[in-house]
Amino acid sequence: MPYSADLDIRVTDSSLRDGSHAKRHQFTVEHVRSIVGALDAAGVPVIEVTHGDGLGGSSFNYGFSHTPEQELIKAAVETAERARIAFLMLPGLGVQSDIREAADNGASICRIATHCTEADISVQHFGLARELGLETVGFLMMSHSQPPEVLAKQARIMADAGCQCVYVVDSAGALILNAVSDRVSALVAELGDDAQVGFHGHENLGLGVANSVLAVEAGALQIDGSTRRFGAGAGNTPVEAFAAVTEKLGIRTGIDTLKIIDAAEDVVRPIMDGDCQLDRLSLMMGYAGVYSSFLKHADSHARRYGVSGAEILIEAGRRKLVGGQEDQLIEIALGLADRGPAGSAVAEKKSA
């Protein structure tokens, strides 16, 4: 069953939310207007805008925003002629008043994210969002860390709370092909007509587009990506590449492939501080199963304490750290510095 009469699937571009991690949360109103204008003209139906860690994320722990996110949401709403504006929030980091303010500023889609075993903390937030007339989307983050049957049960909690689409979220970019299909299929079977299923991928193992196509084949009706992979880690599924592939496969997204390719090169690329690429650290995140937004933090701590960023990430993966535990990366870096090269995480892994 297609997403709608006009679209087989709906694509959400996360460049102005997930890309905030790569930009170190330094987006300006001018950046938002430029990117939203280009994506809107290319036919992208939904554009997500907030701090990388969602509403209320501007903080010492996560990184301070250059411009208050509510101002960015306002600018996005004012600029978009067709696209709808979405926002992300993590319960406990963002609060209910943040949702109300985002709705007042014109955003119409509320995306609520929890760790994939903690869907219960989203219940009251979904209730509020539905009361406000917002469309609701749920994120089961770090979905690689749990088997399909566990994710399906967590998805049921979100759907029963009023969530209209539950996403398998590959926060670490660690899922490989059939692992995506199995998880999406499990959610589709559990939710039936009660809620749609979506997929959010990262490029940390170079599989963003392939995984997203497999998610669609397994029944996902909503897919996330970022233009020119503008996101955490190695970035998200590149919207321009996904648009080209889906066009060749006859999957209707409503996105003009040539226009989104131009937007990626002419508008988004100049705003990026550098390309989001598959390098040593981002590859290590997918390999070790580490939350993608840890990339900049691990790199900074590695430089500060004179240790290997890859070793920091391997240890973070061993500890199974999740979003919100960024402070432990400092502890890991200090431990590596104290132990020296002979006691490094890589050395221990090789000798095991």
From Swiss-Prot:
It is an enzyme of class 4 (lyase). Substrate binds at residues 17-18, 171, 200, 291. Its EC number is 4.1.3.39. One of its GO terms (biological process) is L-leucine biosynthetic process. The active site is at 21 (proton acceptor). SUPFAM superfamilies: Aldolase, post-HMGL domain-like. The keyword NADP does not apply. Keywords: Aromatic hydrocarbons catabolism, Lyase, Manganese, Metal-binding. InterPro entries: 2-IPM_HCS-like, 4OH_2_O-val_aldolase, Aldolase_TIM, DmpG_comm, DRE_TIM_HOA, PYR_CT. GO terms for molecular function: 2-isopropylmalate synthase activity; 4-hydroxy-2-oxovalerate aldolase activity; manganese ion binding. The record marks 17 as: Transition state stabilizer. It comes from the Bacteria. It holds the Pfam family DmpG_comm. Residues 9-261 form the Pyruvate carboxyltransferase domain. Belongs to the 4-hydroxy-2-oxovalerate aldolase family. This is 4-hydroxy-2-oxovalerate aldolase 4. It comes from Rhodococcus jostii (strain RHA1).
